[in-house]
Amino acid sequence: MHPLLNTITDPVKLRALDRKLLPQLADELRQFLVESVAKTGGHLSSNLGTVELTIALHYVFNTPYDRLVWDVGHQTYVHKILTGRREGMSKLRMRGGIAGFPRRDESEYDAFGTAHSSTSISAALGMAVASQWEGKKRSVVAVIGDGAMSAGMAFEALNNAGAMDTNLLVILNDNDMSISRPVGALNNYLARLMSGQFYATARRAGEKMLGVVPHVLELAKRAEEHVKGMVTPSTLFEEFGFNYIGPIDGHDLDVLVSTLNNIRNLRGPQFLHVVTRKGAGYKAAEDDPILYHGVTRFNPDAGIIPKASVKPSYTQVFGDWLCDMAALDQRLVGITPAMREGSGMVRFSHEYADRYFDVGIAEQHAVTFAAGLACDGLKPVVAIYSTFLQRAYDQLIHDVAIQNLPVVFAIDRAGLVGADGPTHAGSFDLTYLRCIPNITVMAPSDENECRQMLYTAFQMNTPAAVRYPRGSGSGVAQQKEMQMLPLGRGEIRREGAEIALLAFGSMLQPCLEAAEELNATVANMRFVKPLDDDLVASLAANHELLVTVEENTVMGGAGSAVLESLSARGRTVPVLQLGLPDTFLDQGDPSQMLSECGLDREGIVHAIRARFPK
């Protein structure tokens, strides 16, 4: 089915191909991509959009000696297929299989591990400087999407790279602009001209000659910008010190290969603007690239058929609460850093468009923007993944907590996230949040508790965070009426003897199951900060062993808070802390991962009996 692709086991074989065969290879790769991802799930539309670009990069550059750094990295499936990992696609994002993102420990072709956005230019610049320092004639390429370019870190790197005049190629993979007007014969011709050696040599010679007459040099540069500006979108990147080339058609292999061949011989920082289409070559993904961005298994002939979930996800619980709360309070505004669908804000964005703010991939800005809104009387709710809130930690402390501003953080994907692996796991939020003064930290055990905690957080006039896991809850009915929970108060969910399980958030259900076998007391702690110190003291006074259970690293997490509470009151009861280990956990099925961490019923029982063998 894929006769040409079957012959490509590495980029050396690719570079030996006749250039005329590359379009056929692209067609076969697309067919294989759709067939493969339909069986495993994964990111589809972004990978379909970068087929030709990936082929051209490996065809022109001498990888892995030449470095390719992919921003975010979810668009690297073709890169993995062409670099000897095609067979591994059958276990994509599964335990023991290849990762959905570049990993240095997976292949020498993965020059830099990525998964969060906007890091590629900084990393590539570091590699370029290191190569220059070592006297190596190595090309270094960073491929970054238009969404990732909205983050400040990308512009910080551009600013640094332009000033250093290092040999570096930045490729903007722009899949958000129309391909019809800016990309055409004239534009492609200009791109080849500007990337050619004659143009580059003439440009540098002219700069040297005119450098003795600064005013004339400035006039010449303005004339050049004027000519470029007639057919290119901006001279912004020229102002950063880059030689801007493009935009060009990212699905025209002849143009891509010719342009890249020219660029690899140029000196100094180069910026190539490539326009692509998400989902290219698979009509269903082209028609709805958002639906096909991240997919579960599906029939490629029929396409994705949405199924109604029996149990609402925590993300859906948040989205419904947000709309309900917005109807009750005109001050509520919702903020997301480019995660509208993932954070459950689609309905809110339609029903309350004037109160909805998608700030782009800019977590730091999102948090400080929320702080500014709160300063002047609005009630901002920031919907953000746990792993991405890490990127705005200083803003969380400096701009929100120190000023004690009423910002609500709805923290999705807390705990393990399965197939996306360690880069997306929310393993640390309880640890990094509970040490910040002024903030309240809550962890719901079910859907209704999540709804009530969000309401509680919104009613407070101080910073508050509600962290909840990915996926569905236990199916508990949600109360339409919302009510404040007693601040810093947990509850006893099961009375037992000798052993007390202190469950935080998602760990309540496995604790209740384990308690049946152990005849243990179970407390639903609800609040990590302020901790229910009285409940902890009472449990310590009436039990021989306390067991804290959390879907967060045990290092500095909720269990540590319990130990601190006991120490402050002079209690010496034994405490067993169960949680995520001090390591980065590989991708896999979430239930399997929890089992391996000892956070299911069997694991909890086993750990307690090993510690308390009565």
UniProtKB/Swiss-Prot annotation:
Gene3D superfamilies noted in UniProt: 3.40.50.920, 3.40.50.970
Keyword Chaperone: no
UniProt keyword terms in alphabetical order: Isoprene biosynthesis, Magnesium, Metal-binding, Thiamine biosynthesis, Thiamine pyrophosphate, Transferase
Free-text cofactor note: Binds 1 Mg(2+) ion per subunit. Binds 1 thiamine pyrophosphate per subunit.
MF GO annotations: 1-deoxy-D-xylulose-5-phosphate synthase activity; magnesium ion binding; thiamine pyrophosphate binding
Binding site for thiamine diphosphate: 74, 115-117, 147-148, 175, 282, 363
Binding site for Mg(2+): 146, 175
Enzyme class: transferase
Reactions mediated catalytically: D-glyceraldehyde 3-phosphate + pyruvate + H(+) = 1-deoxy-D-xylulose 5-phosphate + CO2
Cellular component terms per the entry's GO annotation: cytosol
Pathway(s) of this molecule: Metabolic intermediate biosynthesis; 1-deoxy-D-xylulose 5-phosphate biosynthesis; 1-deoxy-D-xylulose 5-phosphate from D-glyceraldehyde 3-phosphate and pyruvate: step 1/1
Keyword field contains Lipid biosynthesis: no
Cofactor: Mg(2+); thiamine diphosphate
Entry EC no(s): 2.2.1.7
PROSITE patterns, A to Z: TRANSKETOLASE_1 (PS00801), TRANSKETOLASE_2 (PS00802)
Pfam families the record matches: DXP_synthase_N (PF13292), Transket_pyr (PF02779), Transketolase_C (PF02780)
GO annotation terms (biological process): 1-deoxy-D-xylulose 5-phosphate biosynthetic process; isopentenyl diphosphate biosynthetic process, methylerythritol 4-phosphate pathway; terpenoid biosynthetic process; thiamine biosynthetic process
Record InterPro entries: Dxylulose-5-P_synthase (IPR005477), THDP-binding (IPR029061), Transketo_C/PFOR_II (IPR009014), Transketolase-like_Pyr-bd (IPR005475), Transketolase_BS (IPR020826), Transketolase_C (IPR033248), Transketolase_CS (IPR049557)
Subunit structure: Homodimer.
Function: Catalyzes the acyloin condensation reaction between C atoms 2 and 3 of pyruvate and glyceraldehyde 3-phosphate to yield 1-deoxy-D-xylulose-5-phosphate (DXP).
Family that this chain belongs to: Belongs to the transketolase family. DXPS subfamily.
HAMAP family from the UniProt entry: DXP_synth
Official protein name in the record: 1-deoxy-D-xylulose-5-phosphate synthase
